């Protein structure tokens, strides 16, 4: 069994407990009362390279990263530094996240918020919307094609922007066929946890120009952002280097400044 399979088994077990506590109808009622979702595609398009900043306590590959007693405060620092989107881990067993983290971040910041989890059912999409998310992660490797297509369609129908994660060229083809408008290329293989920094450079050319391209994993500073930008990235997702650093606001500001450099102003209308 791969690491991804183990994570999803845990996700399904935790999901069953939440479904027993909160009905789908109740979630839909909460979602209807949530403030309208912000446009995730619009947040990631435009001149330069946008920065998605992550609230992340731990990971399967590195273990504990940061305690993050105040996720809302961290998110506020990210926003003040110029982040375009805040990513919030809500998977509990391996990443130490929760829907409570999503609630607190949503209440604190005005920019779009991404629920980052292992989504396998539409119930989780309604959860995301009920807790104020504007974007949601869908991992191609975790889903059969009919499920991927259905989840993208359902997410968009309730206002969520799917960030569809891929790891190789075959998964890009699946994501494009499923109608993805934003594709994230993760340099970390979730089945083995190995990182290949060349993944984005190899995979990005297969992504059509009209789709927003996000580089995930391996961003430690402005030099990495610039490298990804030169390979065609419209945005980067940054987590570990921010939560383990001493001054996340300044670190984000430095990344944003690099992304706004005139040499990188390759935005599309």
From Swiss-Prot:
Protein name (Swiss-Prot/TrEMBL)? Indole-3-glycerol phosphate synthase 1
| Pathway recorded for this protein | Amino-acid biosynthesis; L-tryptophan biosynthesis; L-tryptophan from chorismate: step 4/5
Q: What class of enzyme is it?
A: lyase
Q: Give an example GO biological process.
A: L-tryptophan biosynthetic process
GO molecular function list: indole-3-glycerol-phosphate synthase activity; phosphoribosylanthranilate isomerase activity
Catalytic activity, as annotated: 1-(2-carboxyphenylamino)-1-deoxy-D-ribulose 5-phosphate + H(+) = (1S,2R)-1-C-(indol-3-yl)glycerol 3-phosphate + CO2 + H2O
Gene name on record?
A: trpC1
What InterPro entries does the entry give? Aldolase_TIM (IPR013785), Indole-3-glycerol_P_synth (IPR045186), Indole-3-glycerol_P_synth_dom (IPR013798), Indole-3-GlycerolPSynthase_CS (IPR001468), RibuloseP-bd_barrel (IPR011060)
Q: Name one Pfam family in it.
A: IGPS
Keywords noted in UniProt = Amino-acid biosynthesis, Aromatic amino acid biosynthesis, Decarboxylase, Lyase, Tryptophan biosynthesis
Q: Family, per the entry? A: Belongs to the TrpC family.
At the top level of its lineage, which domain of life is listed?
Answer: Bacteria
Q: Which PROSITE patterns match?
A: IGPS (PS00614)
Q: Which organism is it from?
A: Streptomyces coelicolor (strain ATCC BAA-471 / A3(2) / M145)
Q: What is its EC number?
A: 4.1.1.48
Q: Is Iron-sulfur set as a keyword in this record?
A: no
Q: Is Cell cycle set as a keyword in this record? A: no
């Amino acid at each position: 069994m791969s690491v991804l399979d183990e994570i999803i088994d845990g996700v399904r077990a935790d999901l069953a407990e939440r479904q027993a506590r909160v009905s789908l109808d109740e979630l839909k009622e909460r979602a209807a009362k949530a403030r309208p979702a912000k446009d995730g595609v619009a947040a990631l398009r435009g001149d330069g390279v946008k920065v998605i900043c992550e609230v992340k306590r731990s990971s399967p590959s590195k273990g504990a990263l940061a305690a993050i007693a105040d996720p809302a405060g961290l998110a506020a620092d990210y926003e003040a530094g110029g982040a375009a989107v805040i990513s919030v881990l809500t998977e509990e067993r391996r990443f130490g996240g929760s829907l409570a983290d999503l609630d607190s971040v949503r209440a604190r910041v005005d920019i779009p918020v991404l629920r980052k989890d292992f989504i396998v059912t539409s119930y989780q999409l309604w959860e995301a919307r009920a807790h104020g998310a504007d974007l949601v992660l869908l991992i191609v490797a975790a889903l059969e094609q009919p499920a991927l297509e259905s989840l993208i369609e359902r997410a968009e129908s309730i206002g969520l922007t799917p960030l569809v994660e891929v790891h190789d060229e075959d998964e890009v083809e699946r994501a494009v066929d499923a109608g993805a408008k934003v594709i994230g290329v993760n340099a970390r293989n979730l089945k083995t946890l190995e990182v290949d920094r060349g993944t984005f450079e190899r995979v990005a050319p297969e992504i059509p120009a009209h789709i927003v391209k996000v580089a995930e994993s391996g961003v430690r500073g402005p030099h990495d952002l610039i490298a990804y930008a030169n390979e065609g990235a419209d945005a980067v997702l940054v987590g570990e280097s921010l939560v383990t650093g001493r001054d996340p606001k300044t670190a984000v500001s430095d990344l944003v400044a690099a992304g706004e450099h005139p040499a990188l102003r390759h935005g599309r209308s």
